[in-house]
């Protein structure tokens, strides 16, 4: 394979833009999408990420101008080695927390290293989300695409170099990458090993949340999202193309690289975002605002304001609220919360929640700061204080998340999670207000 190893990649800035990029001058047709003879003898191909008749503001589609059309492939065969996508575990209302998953000892590439954690929908449904933790120690030689959903990738350890049909992305911990449904890609590991989280979004593509009375600026700013520039591989020789289809891996062997797009234009693109650029908002008077003010991306449902999935972060920020219990409050939620930790510590948990770990609080599961955090917060001097050197996140969804059998049976599941609240005392005194 002819692969670009340059450390300085170029990107296109913006979110939801109608981008255009070409690796050879004049490779993009002018004034039309599908000319009788495309420049350089290329094939025109459309990749649709939404239905043709969606509102124009919600359309996602990209025209590709490639050396060989995607239709040039033999029959897909079901692979003998299948992902750990077993049945979901039994129903449990219990709060769950996991220690970090170990890195593999055997050679494991990106798509072999997915551990299913929770899900609320089968892959053939038009909504829902499945969550995985990935652990890998070998760069991919094959190419992959996911027919089941859009992928939101959250590295916790190790950089990822993602070669996509539209170009190259490199992401490190505290950055994220999003790969559209059906987009072919290959993941290389510049640091030799990697671990992180994946949300597989089966619903509407992720978008920026509405800002409402916040105004026209704040949270994740559109210009900080970066899409790749056109980059193609012109290579002949056997390449395995793997697709995930209804939770199963199927593959065929090509005699060329499928990452052969010389030019493209459209809005259905992979992209990256640096979480450290998030414009964090919070109170400058009293009380702790709702965590929705930390939303980076959202996948909506047909009910206005109800998310199929929100991606929320808890970044470094100043705490200045007066006469206020400053940690996230005790809560019972209509939504379902899967949390992970990229670095540092989470301000509602003094211990037990580690980078690479995870927790699940289902619908109406009572949760909140642990006993140690609560005791310190009640007694704290309420001077301005910065929560620093941290990055936690949450996948929040309106449908109940059920843990997988693998997640329920793995040794990383903490048997004593409930004990972090067990020593919360009763301080009620009816004679003293």
Curated annotation (Swiss-Prot):
Binding site for homogentisate: 346, 367
Binding-site positions, Fe cation: 331, 337, 367
Active site residues of this protein: 288 (proton acceptor)
Pathway the protein acts in: Amino-acid degradation; L-phenylalanine degradation; acetoacetate and fumarate from L-phenylalanine: step 4/6
Lineage: superkingdom: Bacteria
Molecular function (Gene Ontology), one example: iron ion binding
Function: Involved in the catabolism of homogentisate (2,5-dihydroxyphenylacetate or 2,5-OH-PhAc), a central intermediate in the degradation of phenylalanine and tyrosine. Catalyzes the oxidative ring cleavage of the aromatic ring of homogentisate to yield maleylacetoacetate.
Protein name: Homogentisate 1,2-dioxygenase
Species assigned in the record: Pseudomonas putida (strain W619)
Gene name, Swiss-Prot/TrEMBL: hmgA
């Amino acid at each position: 394979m002819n692969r670009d190893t340059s450390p300085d990649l170029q990107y296109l800035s913006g979110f939801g833009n109608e981008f255009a990029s070409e690796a050879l001058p004049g490779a993009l047709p002018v004034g039309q999408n599908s000319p009788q003879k495309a420049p350089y003898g290329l094939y025109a191909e459309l990749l649709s990420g939404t239905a043709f008749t969606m509102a124009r503001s919600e359309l996602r589609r990209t025209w590709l101008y490639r050396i060989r059309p995607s239709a040039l492939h033999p029959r897909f065969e079901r692979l003998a080695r299948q992902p750990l996508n077993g049945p979901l575990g039994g129903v449990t209302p219990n709060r769950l927390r996991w220690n970090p998953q170990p890195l593999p000892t055997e050679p494991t590439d990106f798509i072999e290293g997915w551990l299913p954690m929770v899900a609320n929908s089968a892959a053939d449904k038009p909504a829902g989300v499945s969550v995985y933790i990935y652990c890998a120690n070998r760069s991919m030689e094959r190419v992959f695409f996911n027919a089941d959903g859009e992928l939101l990738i959250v590295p916790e350890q190790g950089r990822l170099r993602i070669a996509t049909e539209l170009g190259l992305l490199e992401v490190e911990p505290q950055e994220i990458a999003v790969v559209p449904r059906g987009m072919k890609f290959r993941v290389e590991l510049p640091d030799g090993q990697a671990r992180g989280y994946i949300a597989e979004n089966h619903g509407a593509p992720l978008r920026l949340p509405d800002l409402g009375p916040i105004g026209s600026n704040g949270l994740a700013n559109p210009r900080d999202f970066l899409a790749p520039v056109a980059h193609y591989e012109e290579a002949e020789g056997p390449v395995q193309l793997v697709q995930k289809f209804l939770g199963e891996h199927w593959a065929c062997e090509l005699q060329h690289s499928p990452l052969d797009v010389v030019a493209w234009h459209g809005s259905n693109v992979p992209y990256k975002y640096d979480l450290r650029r998030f414009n964090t908002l919070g109170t400058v008077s009293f009380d702790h605002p709702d965590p929705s003010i930390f939303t980076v991306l959202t996948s909506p449902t047909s009910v206005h304001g109800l998310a199929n999935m929100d991606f929320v972060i808890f970044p470094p920020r100043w705490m200045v609220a007066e006469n206020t219990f400053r940690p996230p409050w005790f809560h019972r939620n209509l939504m379902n919360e899967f949390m992970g930790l990229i670095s540092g510590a989470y301000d509602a948990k003094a211990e037990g929640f580690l980078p690479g770990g995870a927790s699940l609080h289902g619908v109406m599961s009572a949760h909140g700061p642990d006993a140690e955090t609560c005791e310190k917060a009640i007694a704290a001097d309420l001077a301005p204080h910065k929560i620093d050197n941290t990055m936690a996140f949450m996948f929040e969804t309106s449908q109940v998340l059920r843990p997988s059998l693998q997640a329920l049976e793995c040794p990383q599941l903490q048997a004593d999670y409930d004990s972090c609240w067990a020593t919360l005392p009763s301080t009620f005194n009816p004679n003293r207000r």
